[in-house]
């Protein structure tokens, strides 16, 4: 099974933990995985026992490397499913939209590779935690595609037109870059992830969205975070003055 769904009893209420579990493909999203995620979210949205949701990735290397391009390529090449690309992207975009609009607090915990469709999933989470080894990117331009999965919304919100920079270059951001531009809310050490889940399970969740969201917000602000001085230096910070000058030019050709 490439997506795992656990329903954990808390001190009061339940917590849904959704784990992308295909480490061999860096948890890349196949069409089947997208269908699984959507089914799980639909079930939890309508289950009064589930008060909060956590989304994470299995394995040591990635939260999610994006859509399973190999699956799409093979489907197109053999000609057996000409409708698959349209169906795949339609389902993926709908899933991303539903994460953004999920009626209960959603916490994303990302490590390692977070690219393309993985960033689409992560950006939809209400709260976004990253580990120091995280690498974020929207690399679609390198395969002749465009930044999708809601990127026209979340890239446009980045400061200094850095969303344009990410979209045009496919540049990779490290943990300090990610926090600097607001694509994540805070950092967490890998060894603290399980402790955080234990802490969440010890809470009293009410099933009232506003109250549970407030409780989760306060809890996250109480957890221990890495000393930010020990994190890798921001690549973007070194180049921001020059890049901003170019990114404000009126056309992409001039940029």
Which residues make up each language-model segment?
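Gly/Pro- and small hydrophobic-enriched strand-loop and loop-to-helix capping segments
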Residues: 125-147, 182-197, 255
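Globin-like tetrapyrrole-binding proteins
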Residues: 196-198, 207-228
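Conserved small/polar residues in nucleotide/adenosyl-binding loops
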Residues: 245-251
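Hydrophobic/aromatic residues within transmembrane alpha-helices
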Residues: 55, 68, 121-122, 177-178
């Amino acid at each position: 099974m490439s997506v795992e769904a656990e329903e954990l009893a808390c001190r009061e209420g339940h917590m849904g933990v959704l784990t992308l579990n295909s480490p061999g493909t860096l948890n890349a999203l196949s069409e089947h995985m997208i269908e699984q995620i959507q089914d799980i979210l639909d079930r939890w949205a309508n289950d009064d026992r589930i008060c909060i949701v956590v989304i994470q990735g299995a394995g040591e290397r990635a939260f999610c490397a994006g859509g399973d391009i190999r699956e799409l390529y093979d489907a197109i090449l053999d000609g057996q499913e000409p409708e698959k690309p349209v169906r795949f992207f339609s389902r993926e975009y709908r899933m991303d939209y539903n994460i953004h609009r999920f009626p209960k607090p959603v916490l994303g915990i990302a490590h390692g590779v977070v690219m393309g469709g993985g960033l689409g999933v992560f950006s939809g989470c209400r709260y976004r935690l990253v580990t120091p080894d995280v690498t974020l990117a929207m690399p679609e331009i390198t395969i002749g595609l465009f930044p999708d999965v809601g990127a026209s919304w979340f890239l446009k919100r980045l400061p200094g037109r850095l969303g344009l920079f990410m979209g045009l270059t496919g540049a990779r951001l490290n943990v300090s870059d990610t926090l600097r531009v607001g694509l994540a809310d805070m950092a967490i050490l890998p060894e603290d992830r399980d402790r955080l889940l234990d802490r969440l399970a010890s809470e009293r969740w009410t099933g009232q969205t506003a109250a549970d969201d407030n409780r989760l917000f306060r809890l996250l602000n109480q957890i221990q975070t890495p000393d930010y001085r020990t994190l890798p230096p921001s690549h973007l910070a070194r180049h921001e003055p020059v890049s901003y000058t170019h990114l404000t030019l009126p056309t992409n050709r001039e940029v």
